[in-house]
């Protein structure tokens, strides 16, 4: 293997040694299989190809200053995948099997885990697909769960710095009672046009309002939104927002640090009142928002005049990263050591 330049890694795919797989057949999950193949041999009538029976997750393994390799809240990823399975009628993967497969694939690809000082990490992508053949619209009778990994650099090339976003009314990410709360591929397909147009206009990502009234904050790109004002951490409550594990963790840390926490509808006009704002998720942890433009209304909500992250966002970012890397005390038991 040629030497990897850890410091120049993008947030992209790199071939590693192994992935792990498990089949669901005849009403039961089978044994864990190890593969070095990057491709899948799929039936042309598989439900994942025609009817969107596909759900995935994203988490990371971190090489820490003490030399150990930790993962962050993988039980929450297992629970969210189970929720997605219920939402689109796929068999739920037991938490124990999920965690065993994460552990196995990380250990088998240890040489691809970036060193601590690089700022990079090992991205873990669990994927569950309907493989059984169906021509009518109904659930498959056979499924494949697999996990592959890839070393990745920061999601945003600028690292922990503030980025501009743009409100879109032209597109909706998900319907109010649709699949927005599940991590399924269709939600991301629905965001591709909006994302492309936002990037083409010079923005970091698109910013969605609620699909029903176009009045309330929904998601920003593929991440959850939060705003800070009056020592309060405020994040939207909506039936179409993916429950972010990072956001859930930040809410707890905000409370730990003495902030009030509110999860409630946020009208667009309230953006004017926030002292800080950010997007949060596994990929970037926190991406501070420099400003949110509303091109249709000719308005701009500015949170950072100098482009630097705000003090509370910075404090929360450092605290969460500290827990993930085993630097801060893990008082909530969020991390698990996979490699000593």
Predicted regions and their residues:
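Charged, gly/pro-rich active-site loop segments
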Residues: 95-97, 105-119
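Helix-start/capping segments and mature chain N-termini
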Residues: 1-105, 127, 134-340
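Extended, Lys/Arg-enriched charged tracts that mediate electrostatic binding to polyanionic substrates
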Residues: 115-129
């Amino acid at each position: 293997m040629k030497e990897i330049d850890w410091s120049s890694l993008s947030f992209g795919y790199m071939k590693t040694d192994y992935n792990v797989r498990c089949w669901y057949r005849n009403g039961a999950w089978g044994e864990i299989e190890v593969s070095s193949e990057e491709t899948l041999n799929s039936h042309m009538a598989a439900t994942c190809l025609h009817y969107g029976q596909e759900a995935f997750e994203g988490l990371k393994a971190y090489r820490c200053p003490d030399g150990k390799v930790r993962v962050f809240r993988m039980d929450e990823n297992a629970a969210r995948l189970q929720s997605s399975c219920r939402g689109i009628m796929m068999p739920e993967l037991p938490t124990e099997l999920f965690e065993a497969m994460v552990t196995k694939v990380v250990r088998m690809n240890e040489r691809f885990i970036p060193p601590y000082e690089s700022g990079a990490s090992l991205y873990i992508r669990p994927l569950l697909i309907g493989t059984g053949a169906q021509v009518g619209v109904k659930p498959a009778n056979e499924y494949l769960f697999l996990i592959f990994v890839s070393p990745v650099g920061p999601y945003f090339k600028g690292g922990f710095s503030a980025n501009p976003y743009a409100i879109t009314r032209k597109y909706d990410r998900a319907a109010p009672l649709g699949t927005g709360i599940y991590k399924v591929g269709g939600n991301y397909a629905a965001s591709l046009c909006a994302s492309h147009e936002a990037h083409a206009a010079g923005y970091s990502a698109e910013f969605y309002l609620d699909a029903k009234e176009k009045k309330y904050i929904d998601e920003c790109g593929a991440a959850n939104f939060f705003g800070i004002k009056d020592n309060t951490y405020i994040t939207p409550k909506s039936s179409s927002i993916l429950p972010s594990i990072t956001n859930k963790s930040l809410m707890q840390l905000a409370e730990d640090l003495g902030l009030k926490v509110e999860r409630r509808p946020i009208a667009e006009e309230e953006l004017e009142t926030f002292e800080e704002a950010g997007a949060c998720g596994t990929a970037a942890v926190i991406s501070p928002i420099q400003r949110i433009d509303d091109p249709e209304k000719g308005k701009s909500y500015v949170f950072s005049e100098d482009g630097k992250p705000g003090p509370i966002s910075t404090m929360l970012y450092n605290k969460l990263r500290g827990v993930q890397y085993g630097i801060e005390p893990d008082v909530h038991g969020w991390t698990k050591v996979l490699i000593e």
